[in-house]
From Swiss-Prot:
InterPro entries: bL21-like, bL21-like_sf, Ribosomal_bL21, Ribosomal_bL21_CS. It comes from the Bacteria. The gene is rplU. GO terms for cellular component: cytoplasm; ribonucleoprotein complex; ribosome. This is Large ribosomal subunit protein bL21. PANTHER family: 50S RIBOSOMAL PROTEIN L21 (PTHR21349), LARGE RIBOSOMAL SUBUNIT PROTEIN BL21M (PTHR21349:SF0).
Amino acid sequence: MYAVVRTGGKQYKVSEGDFLKVEKLEGAVGDTIELKDILMVGGETVKIGTPLVPSASVVGKIVEQGKDKKILVFKSKKRKDSKKLRGHRQPRTVLKIEKING
């Protein structure tokens, strides 16, 4: 069984037992989170939401809270001595998908 989940403005296809890196979710390591924005549930029968499947949910456990790899943002002005170098690390949460209801 699989599901298409929407979280953090992105869509992910998940199955039970998968590890999923998503935008930061509130909670501590070991907490259980229930995701309600389910766009589609597949398996023997397929349920497609309009836009959401009303009775479906995905239960996951927070495995890790951390930051992604650093990305560098470099800006410069032509023919000037103006340069900026900035780094950014996006906060992220790693979930282990435990159960798909629906």
